[in-house]
Amino acid sequence: MQERKRVLVKFSGEALAGENGFGIENSILKFIASEIKELIKNQIEVGIVIGGGNIIRGVSAAKGGLIKRTSGDHMGMLATVINAIAIQEALESSGLEVRVQSAIQMEAFCETYIMRRAQRHLEKGRVVVFAAGTGNPYFTTDTTAILRAVEIDADMVIKATKVNGVYDKDPKQFDDAVFLNTLSYDEAMQDNIKVMDDTAIALAKDNKLPIVVCNMFEEGNLLKIIQGDTSLCSIVKNN
């Protein structure tokens, strides 16, 4: 009998916008749906966390001083709900069963997050999209991804981004940037390394949860990673 695999995939909100830089690009939704469908076909249980940066970022909204940081973060949480509903529609259009669970109660749109209910959905082959972050300001959607992964007992978190992994410095600015295939949690928390915020990585470290950073636009990438091929991405784990 094949061993059950359960993963949490984190998508950035900006990635949904494509070249537009804002809003939601339908072609990207369709691509995400096709990639997730392949995982479900291979008996992999999938949870998803999506950012809201294609609509608004709490930190950016609060920069001018008019909007408080807490209110900015609340606005960001609502943005993730918009994205979660969009992903739900795309996944359902591809024939998958999907549930959106929000950390903030909004019964007209989605379920309220309950850990045990989320686990049951996953066991039944449904995709669960976790929205509204942790429900608290000052916590990123990266931290949300790690938290939900720990709660649902996921085997790994895959951070699907617009780049193929982690570098020792910004490859867009430095031609000599070195690609890092494997990092420890402590290395991932160094100032020059941009994987996730320190709160997220510390939580992953405490729970020995691997984090894989990969290019979300590489067809078949998610399935390859879960099946053990991490040659074209970066993985953060215990040494």
Curated annotation (Swiss-Prot):
CDD domains to which the protein is assigned, alphabetical: AAK_UMPK-PyrH-Ec (cd04254)
Binding-site positions, UMP: 52, 73, 134-141
Metabolic or biological pathway: Pyrimidine metabolism; CTP biosynthesis via de novo pathway; UDP from UMP (UMPK route): step 1/1
Activity modulation comment: Allosterically activated by GTP. Inhibited by UTP.
Entry binding sites for ATP: 10-13, 53, 57, 161, 167, 170
GO molecular function (one): ATP binding
Region of interest called Involved in allosteric activation by GTP, as start-end residue ranges on this chain: 18-23
Any one GO biological process: 'de novo' CTP biosynthetic process
EC numbers: 2.7.4.22
UniProt keyword terms in alphabetical order: Allosteric enzyme, ATP-binding, Cytoplasm, Kinase, Nucleotide-binding, Pyrimidine biosynthesis, Transferase
Enzyme class of the recorded protein, top EC level: transferase
Complex formation: Homohexamer.
Function: Catalyzes the reversible phosphorylation of UMP to UDP.
Family in the record: Belongs to the UMP kinase family.
Protein's recorded name: Uridylate kinase
